[in-house]
């Protein structure tokens, strides 16, 4: 091995990630409606929707076979809450739950580690109509959903992610209006929603630890624009690190991991922070782009179809900065 080579350990997890509304389809089969099902029409640029998608609900065995074929040893998927509780009685929908049992069994049978995301943007309409994140009931409703899933699947699943990209579904869905349910609200409403999501995260962590059959590994999966250093001088690294966590990364991560309200999260009380900050086993990070105030850095960078600069080394700095701040094992749970 050359000195500049890094050898990944044998138990390193190489995987892929999806979300229920992105791939499952079967939107009205063994499932209640979600906010994406009822608000996407007229709000998505090219008219895409979640009705059929990849038809993963009916073709999951083929999909798992493809995962095995390309050599994945882990797979992150999300549970559709509306598939577990699909009517107003709050009775468990066994057909929906059995889908996830069967999927998990198929993954394990093929030597693929299942990693479960409990919320990936798709609030059930039944919960939304109760007030959603603005309802005092949300935390207990989410806790009951988590308990149901954990009791059913934790004999096979070790890795749990409470929320995927709260920065996106809160600020994109309720402030900027570019994600479901496509609302534009003021600061007070957005802060109230942030508080609810963070409290629900804490409740989910406690619930997983209480009911899990296998010893659980728990985290959450934020995303944020990483500020790239222009060079590796100590001063520049510190500037980039500080700037990264002045935004959404610190606003969400500090309360949930450190129990500290910083960078625009000062609306949280000490009691809130106590309930939000439960010990985590890893810090997940979805890394899609870098950011830098210096346009000089961006000149000549290749760009994605979304216009985002492609900087492979951003994954290195994301992991480096996240570990420096939170001291937890790092999962890169999405990248692109």
Task: Give a label for each model feature.
Residues 2-44, 87-89, 97-335:
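Active-site region of glycoside hydrolase catalytic domains
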Residues 24-100:
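Active-site-adjacent substrate/metal-binding segments within catalytic domains
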């Amino acid at each position: 091995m050359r000195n500049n080579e890094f050898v990944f350990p044998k138990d390193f997890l190489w995987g892929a990630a999806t979300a229920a509304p992105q791939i499952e389809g079967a939107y009205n089969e063994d499932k209640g409606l979600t906010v994406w099902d009822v608000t996407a029409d007229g709000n998505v640029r090219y008219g895409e929707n979640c009705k059929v998608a990849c038809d993963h609900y009916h073709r999951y065995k083929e999909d798992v076979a493809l995962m095995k074929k390309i050599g994945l040893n882990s797979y992150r998927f999300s549970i559709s809450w509306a598939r577990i509780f699909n009517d107003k009685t709050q009775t468990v929908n066994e057909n929906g739950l059995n889908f996830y049992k069967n999927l998990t069994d198929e993954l394990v049978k093929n030597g693929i580690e299942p990693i479960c995301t409990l919320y990936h943007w798709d609030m059930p309409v039944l919960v939304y109509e109760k007030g959603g994140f603005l309802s005092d009931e949300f935390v207990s409703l989410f806790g009951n959903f988590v308990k149901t899933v954990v009791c059913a699947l934790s004999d096979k699943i070790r890795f749990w992610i409470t929320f995927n990209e709260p920065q996106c579904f809160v600020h994109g869905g309720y402030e900027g209006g570019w994600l479901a349910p496509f609302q534009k609200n003021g600061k007070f409403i957005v802060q109230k929603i942030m508080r609810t999501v963070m409290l629900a995260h804490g409740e989910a962590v406690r619930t997983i630890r209480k009911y899990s059959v296998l010893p659980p590994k728990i985290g959450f999966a934020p995303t944020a624009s990483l500020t790239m250093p222009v060079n590796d001088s100590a001063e520049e690294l510190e500037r980039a690190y500080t700037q990264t966590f002045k935004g959404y990364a610190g606003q969400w991560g500090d309360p949930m991991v450190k129990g500290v309200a910083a960078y625009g999260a000062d609306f949280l009380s000490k009691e809130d922070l106590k309930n939000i900050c439960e010990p985590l086993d890893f810090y997940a990070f979805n890394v899609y782009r870098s950011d830098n105030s210096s346009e000089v850095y961006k000149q000549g960078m290749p760009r994605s179809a979304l216009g985002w600069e492609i900087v492979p080394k951003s994954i290195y700095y994301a992991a480096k900065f996240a570990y420096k701040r939170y001291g937890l094992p790092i999962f890169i749970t999405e990248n692109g």
